[in-house]
Regions:
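Phosphate-bearing ligand-interacting subdomains
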Residues: 22-25, 129-206
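Extreme N-terminal segment that seeds HTH/winged-HTH DNA-binding domains in transcriptional regulators
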Residues: 1-30
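NAD(P)-binding Rossmann-fold cofactor-contacting core
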Residues: 105-129
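HTH-adjacent hinge/linker in prokaryotic transcriptional regulators
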Residues: 31, 35, 40-83
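Glycine-rich Rossmann-fold phosphate-binding loop(s) that bind the pyrophosphate
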Residues: 91
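Hydrophobic/small residue at the entry helix of a nucleotide-binding pocket
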Residues: 94
């Protein structure tokens, strides 16, 4: 079903499809079409069909897609048909917002610990957690074989934190710091920098 040769831009659209389909289910809809899905997302129906065809045939011409079935298939493709344990590094304002966000678990991700190297923060409550020191994080990652981390530290601390995560066994990092990390080729990094998105939008604003 899954091909490692699928372009990143296509993989990046799959979560958008999954989210839109989940909204359809919550509205009581059972069947959809590439045109319906495309209108919700601002993506052409041809592009949606092309994207999905990279992974198999999920619908029939004239009858559309069974939404529940397509959701199940997309979850398998994205490997979110299970719960992933995640560590959060950084307990500043951004880290606190991330720790308190309730939408992770319902979409396949469970934060299992929050860590910070500031002695004044260690031991303090944050969301449902108590902030722990980084040495405990390394132990936890190795012990529970955790593969995903979220990095919400200042730019100056991001590279060292990433190196520690990789050393402990993390294979994927979601980085909120406005910097570029140097990691091994087999470690996946995704960046979230709101300023970059704002700068992209202002290009289109006269």
């Amino acid at each position: 079903m899954q091909s490692l040769s699928v372009p990143d831009i296509i993989v990046g659209r799959l979560p958008l499809y999954l989210r839109a389909l989940s909204h359809m289910i919550s509205e009581g809809q059972e069947i959809t079409s590439s045109q319906d899905l495309g209108e919700r997302l601002g993506i052409s129906s041809a592009q949606i069909r092309k994207d999905l065809s990279q992974f198999g045939e999920f619908g029939k011409q004239g009858t559309g897609y069974n939404i529940s079935f397509l959701i199940d298939q997309l979850r398998k493709i994205l490997h979110v048909d299970r719960i992933w344990d995640v560590v959060l590094v950084g307990a500043g304002d951004l880290g606190r917002a991330v720790a308190n966000y309730r939408g992770f678990l319902e979409r396949g991700f469970r934060i299992i610990g929050v860590y910070d190297n500031d002695p004044k923060k260690v031991g303090q409550p944050i969301g449902d957690f108590v902030i722990e020191e980084p040495s405990r994080m390394m132990e936890k990652i190795r012990q529970d074989r955790i593969e995903i981390a979220m990095l919400a530290v200042p730019s100056a601390a991001a590279q060292e934190a990433a190196e520690n995560l990789v050393e402990a066994g993390v294979r994927a990092i979601l980085c909120y710091a406005p910097t570029s990390l140097k990691v091994p080729k087999d470690v996946r990094v995704q960046y979230i920098d709101p300023v970059l998105h704002l700068q992209r939008m202002t290009y289109y604003v006269p």
